[in-house]
A protein has these predicted regions:
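Residue-level preference for short coil/turn positions at secondary-structure junctions
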Residues: 4-5, 29, 48, 68-69, ...
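N-terminal beta1-alpha1-beta2 submodule of the flavodoxin-like/Rossmannoid cofactor-binding fold
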Residues: 6-8, 27-34, 38-46
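Structural motif
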Residues: 8, 71-72, 111
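Conserved SAM-binding loop
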Residues: 11, 35, 52
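Glycine-centered flexibility sites
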Residues: 13-19, 30, 55, 69, ...
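NAD(P)H-binding glycine-rich loop region in Rossmannoid oxidoreductase-like domains
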Residues: 41-95, 99, 103
Length: 121
């Protein structure tokens, strides 16, 4: 991936797992990164091209604010598998994606990569 030195990528679900690995790879590729997580202080990086943003991916207003000034979105939401969640499933991925796409429709952002977890909905 060749980075445009002025490109900014929003990574949703950036505090750990695939999300945090994606943050590291995007920074290494030269992108500026806006990392959204419920607890952005958990993101362990001090890279000057990293902007940490606390927020809830299920909140429309949060997603609209997070999209301002970004060129692309990588959605990497995950859940901690609990016995209840494994047997009942989750709608986190479908709901968050719907909210994100709605927010993108009123923004200028048109690029989206979404990585979801193994829990069936």
């Amino acid at each position: 991936m060749r980075a445009d030195p002025t490109s900014t990528v929003l990574i949703v679900g950036a505090s750990r797992g695939i999300g945090f690995e994606t943050v590291k790879l995007a920074l290494k590729a030269g992108h500026s990164v806006r990392a959204l997580a419920r607890s952005a202080t958990a993101i362990r990086s001090r890279d000057p091209k990293l902007e940490k943003l606390d927020g809830d991916a299920l909140d429309q207003h949060t997603m609209e604010r997070a999209l301002v000034g970004v060129d692309a979105v990588i959605q990497t939401l995950g859940v901690s598998p609990t016995p209840e969640l494994i047997f009942s499933g989750t709608r986190l991925f479908s709901i968050a994606t719907r909210i994100l796409v709605n927010a993108m429709e009123v923004s200028t952002v048109r690029r989206l990569i979404s990585v979801t977890g193994p829990i069936e909905e």
